[in-house]
Amino acid sequence: MESTSNTQTNSHRAEGKQRGSCHCGAVQFEVDLAPGTKGSRCNCSVCTKTAMTSFLLKPDAFRLLTLESALSSYEQGYKTSQRYFCKTCGVQCFGRGHLAEVGGDYVSINANCLDDVEPTSIEAIYWDGRHDNWQSGPRDAPWPTFTQA
């Protein structure tokens, strides 16, 4: 069995221009990630159930390369974001929304949909979305899911 070197992991870091897609390839996109961009983990019910790490980006750093007709969407009850899924394979690829606490309009991409990024290379920050506690900002340790910190 071949050993995996750190060089391989380092060459698949989450920075620069990256392409992403759903499982079947019907949805494709491109993003620009600044060096040092951290992934976000949220404890809201949707993020908890999808176990997603995302990158929060300004809308101009995201380009959808396929037609919107390939997508289905879901809007959460508090209407701060719209989540987009592939109509064919069901993978949630990205979301769009507006939240003043994260800088206004944003696109949130599913980091696991990036085609050439090693998921273990992503350093995460944590948000308390379950308690609508955006004003506290992110932190380096996970927020509790069932109790408020």
Regions found by a protein language model. Give the residues of each.
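A short Gly-Trp-Pro
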Residues: 1-21, 26-149
